[in-house]
């Protein structure tokens, strides 16, 4: 009887491990954010409380607990006005770069930071400059890079925030619309291989079906996109991303009235905003959507994290790679993987 070699065992282990494990809290669909990069989204918006403690990418342990919302449509709402170092509830609207990293060089770097002055935005300058991004040497100012997210892998550097260029790529190269989930308004994004679940229809604002992306439109362009929780579960499982209209918080910690349909999400990018006191991010309302809306960095916006997918090893949206198996054929030992046969040297038969 032939014995399987150590090389064959190594091959077996390698082939079996080709399916990359996504972090806890990941949504199933993969989205291209550039020609050669894909991400998966966290299942909900980022939230923070001053209670507890967590580990950070620089090896320190910091005050507070970070988590992602249980559902894509969950928001904190007007409770964000209670933001303070001694507030023990959760918030989900943050100033730009407020990961808690003291090395950022910004005066306001904590998630509870406020600077209610006429020059408030200057307190959020990363590295002492108005043109630095939350990348490279300042990547720890990115909430997902610096912090362990308690219910999403609980390790630093598992997640990150999209850049403005990546947000633009998402807008142009995928499908999107506006919708309501059990009454919660928001922006809905779909991968290009999205198939509508049986009995559920979607009216798209953008489906790569015109020369120019429609930054402005009418509510009639997405009329009928209203879904129950149960229907949304099916949409989510099919690949839909939902960014709820979680509103914005001004630098005086107030949320304006009458903006329940407004959603605004940070990117890591400042360096091509029109004003050094601002940074870029996704913004939308009932009649507009734009991947690069500028707002004062002292304002509180939502954060939706992503995890980078290794395209060589990641799972497909709809299928799971099978485990490799040892098989014996005509007295020879082979490795069977995804329906293909390999010899012990790794050569496909």
Q: Could you tell me what each predicted segment is?
A:
Residues 21-311:
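Conserved positions within compact, well-structured domain cores
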Residues 1-4, 19-20:
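Positively charged n-region of N-terminal signal peptides that target proteins for export
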Residues 5-9:
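Sec-dependent signal peptide hydrophobic core
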Residues 10-18:
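Hydrophobic h-region of N-terminal signal peptides that target proteins for export
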């Amino acid at each position: 009887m032939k014995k399987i070699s150590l090389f064959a065992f190594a091959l077996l282990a390698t082939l079996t491990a080709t399916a990359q494990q996504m972090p806890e809290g990941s949504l199933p669909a993969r989205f291209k954010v550039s020609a050669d990069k894909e991400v998966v989204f966290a299942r909900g918006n980022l939230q923070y409380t001053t209670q507890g403690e967590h580990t950070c990418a620089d090896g320190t342990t910091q005050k507070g607990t970070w988590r992602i919302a249980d559902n894509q449509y969950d928001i904190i709402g007007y409770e964000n006005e209670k933001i303070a170092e001694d507030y023990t509830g959760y918030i989900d609207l943050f100033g730009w770069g407020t990961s808690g990293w003291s090395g950022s060089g910004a005066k306001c770097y904590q998630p509870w930071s406020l600077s209610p002055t006429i020059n408030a935005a200057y307190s959020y300058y990363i590295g002492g400059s108005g043109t630095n991004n939350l990348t490279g040497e300042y990547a720890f100012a990115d909430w997902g890079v610096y912090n362990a997210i308690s219910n999403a892998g609980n390790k630093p550097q598992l997640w990150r925030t999209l850049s403005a260029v990546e947000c633009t790529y998402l807008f142009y190269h995928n499908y999107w619309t506006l919708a309501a989930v059990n009454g919660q308004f928001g922006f809905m994004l779909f991968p290009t291989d999205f198939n509508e679940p049986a009995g559920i229809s979607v009216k798209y604002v953008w489906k790569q079906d015109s020369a120019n992306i429609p930054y402005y439109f009418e509510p009639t362009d997405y009329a009928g996109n209203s879904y129950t929780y149960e229907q949304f579960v099916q949409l989510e499982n099919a690949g839909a991303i939902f960014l709820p209209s979680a509103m914005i918080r001004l630098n005086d910690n107030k949320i304006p009235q009458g903006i329940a349909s407004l959603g605004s999400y940070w990117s890591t990018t400042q360096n091509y905003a029109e004003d050094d006191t601002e940074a870029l991010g996704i913004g939308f309302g009932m009649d507009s959507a734009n991947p690069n809306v500028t707002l004062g960095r002292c304002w509180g916006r939502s954060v939706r994290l992503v995890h980078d997918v290794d395209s060589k090893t990641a799972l497909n949206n709809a299928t799971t790679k099978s485990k490799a198996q040892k098989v014996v054929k005509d007295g020879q030992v082979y490795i069977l993987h995804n329906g293909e046969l390999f010899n012990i040297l790794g050569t496909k038969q």
